[in-house]
């Protein structure tokens, strides 16, 4: 039977519920338990797929093609369980399901209400998402007290009553601020946050107190007294230099032992040696490189969360400190490529829309002509193809139909038909809805022998995740190949270009998929590791 840990947040948002949940899950997994994590988002969007990165940050794509919250990326980086569409749902998704049932007449003419209909659907999805896991952590987005979160909190209250206190508990994250003028931490916001929880029928069993300073024993005792929480269950979580050290920090305070005792679980001690190795390698690099990341969402780096972490993982695996220089592609267009001078490698990530595209094309040209290692991802492949077509293959007005529908050389165009991973044909056109209409999720890719990417992966067939609506125009591929561009990877049916390389270049790889979604701190990712090695070689040759 699955046990449930409901994770809530108080005082302020962005406390790190996702990291705390993932870290706790990592400890429980290290004790031999089967663990999964769900994220419940209170916003009314059906999914984050059409939301601006400035609003929401990164959209994390699962193996089965769901566009989900970036917290699912944290979950996959911390535990071995692969997330699916069942691990993330929103208020919008819940209401959509309930309204569809109402239209079908499933409620037999009854009045459809938040309680019980919405809360029942939330509970159904939680139980379904938990599956056969020993422990399911359920993170509820937002802050306790928000109107949007109330149906989710009510549903979890009901679920705890239904399964019993031996199978469910509440873990509440709060902020314990440090007041510099007084020279002490203040517990009052935490007391009020718990008071807010109790007003809606929820009593936290564990408090995780976030603070930039250490929380002394007397403050923890005071918090325990005023919140009706056992003193040893008041966990202090200071700001950490590395998020990958948090499993050790929580384990040192016995958080996993509290949970195992409460649930009556039989399992071994936690083996956190892999995490200790990750932290040690991150803290003691032997080399250093600087990589330029040229994109359009540089004001909010959460838009590139998985990518930043993937570079960090590759650095850990190569015992290399990776410094990332974040450069807005519009600035490259306005100020020139001098902004790129002094870097050891260049990465152009994915993105949507025309803004900043010409700056990315200039960036690609700079990397190609100056023999600087280049990795292009998604749009980073498309701009690489456009640049090569314009400046090497003689197609001066080459462009993507996304940005210039009238181009005489549309080297990138809308995919109207493709096969999904199961071999089923999917079709789209310009009139298709924006939400959920892309080529999404894990797809097989066949790598060409002798290519750089084939050497990185060490195998001929790989599986990577996609999120795109445009693709290299197959009709113009022969002209590009004649001009020296190498197609190094094809889709499973051989119809779509997945990877391109430039032959007379030390390391120039551009892929249509998103390898960052499969990178983890313990296992890294072969493509990013190869990229960082190329950056190291370039740095050593200067």
Swiss-Prot record:
Residue numbers binding L-glutamine: 351, 379-382, 402, 469
Binding site for UTP: 13, 186-191, 222
Gene3D superfamilies linked to this entry: 3.40.50.880, P-loop containing nucleotide triphosphate hydrolases
Chain positions recorded as ATP binding sites: 14-19, 71
Binding residues for Mg(2+): 71, 139
Alphabetized UniProt keyword annotations: ATP-binding, Glutamine amidotransferase, Ligase, Magnesium, Metal-binding, Nucleotide-binding, Pyrimidine biosynthesis
Xref: CDD domains: CTPS_N, GATase1_CTP_Synthase
Entry superkingdom: Bacteria
Chain ranges of the Glutamine amidotransferase type-1 domain: 290-541
Pathway listed: Pyrimidine metabolism; CTP biosynthesis via de novo pathway; CTP from UDP: step 2/2
UniProt function note: Catalyzes the ATP-dependent amination of UTP to CTP with either L-glutamine or ammonia as the source of nitrogen. Regulates intracellular CTP levels through interactions with the four ribonucleotide triphosphates.
Family per similarity comment: Belongs to the CTP synthase family.
Name of this protein: CTP synthase
